[in-house]
């Protein structure tokens, strides 16, 4: 998880309809995050990108990581899943922006069109029997929004159900 968070990059994902793009970083209140990361190792030198789309979410008291084999999605693009942790009561992701504001949703829905870039990703996870554990990752210095929200990017439907 740490490697994914520290290798976050500003690359949106094109969907199969060619009109919708998923933002480089998506967070909702259902304990869900989806992002594009760099540094996907390729020791067999397959013809593919070194960028990868990954997600984390809570499913049936399990922390699950999803990942796609291709960055841009066709009609048949289904993620593969890995169970990372069991006996998880709750998962929450937040973005702390460069102005110090905490966001439960990302990208933020602002009427003015002005937005700060993400500075950190916060994970709050409640695990039996340890209780609440919080982890904060500083995101790479990447200009995500550049002070402007891009109207072409959407939260869309970022992940297929398990």
Regions found by a protein language model. Name each.
Residues 2-74:
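Extracytoplasmic beta-strand-rich oligomerization domains located immediately C-terminal to a leader/signal peptide
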Residues 20-21, 49-51, 79, 88, ...:
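Short beta-strand-initiation
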Residues 26, 47, 84, 114, ...:
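Sterically constrained small-residue positions within well-ordered secondary structures
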Residues 45-47, 73-82, 134-135, 145-148:
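A short, polar/proline- and glycine-enriched secondary-structure boundary/capping micro-motif
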Residues 56, 82-84, 135-139:
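Generic detection of short hydrophobic beta-strand segments and adjacent strand-loop junctions
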Residues 82-95:
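Structured surface patches comprising rigid loops and adjacent beta-strands/short helices at the edges
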Residues 92-162:
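Short linear sequence signals and composition-biased patches located at protein termini or domain-edge surfaces
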């Amino acid at each position: 998880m740490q490697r994914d968070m520290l290798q976050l990059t500003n690359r949106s994902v094109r969907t199969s309809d060619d009109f919708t793009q998923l933002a480089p970083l998506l967070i909702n209140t259902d304990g869900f995050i989806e992002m594009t990361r760099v540094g996907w190792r390729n020791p067999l030198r397959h013809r593919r990108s070194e960028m990868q789309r990954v997600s984390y979410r809570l499913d049936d008291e399990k922390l699950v990581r999803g990942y796609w084999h291709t960055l841009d999605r066709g009609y048949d693009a289904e993620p593969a899943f890995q169970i990372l942790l069991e006996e998880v009561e709750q998962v929450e992701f937040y973005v702390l922006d460069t102005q110090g504001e905490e966001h439960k949703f990302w990208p933020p829905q602002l009427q003015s069109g002005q937005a700060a870039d993400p500075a950190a990703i916060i994970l709050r996870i409640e695990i039996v029997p340890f209780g609440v554990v919080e982890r904060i990752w500083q995101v790479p210095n990447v200009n995500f929004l550049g002070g402007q929200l891009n109207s072409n990017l959407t939260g869309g439907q970022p992940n297929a159900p398990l």
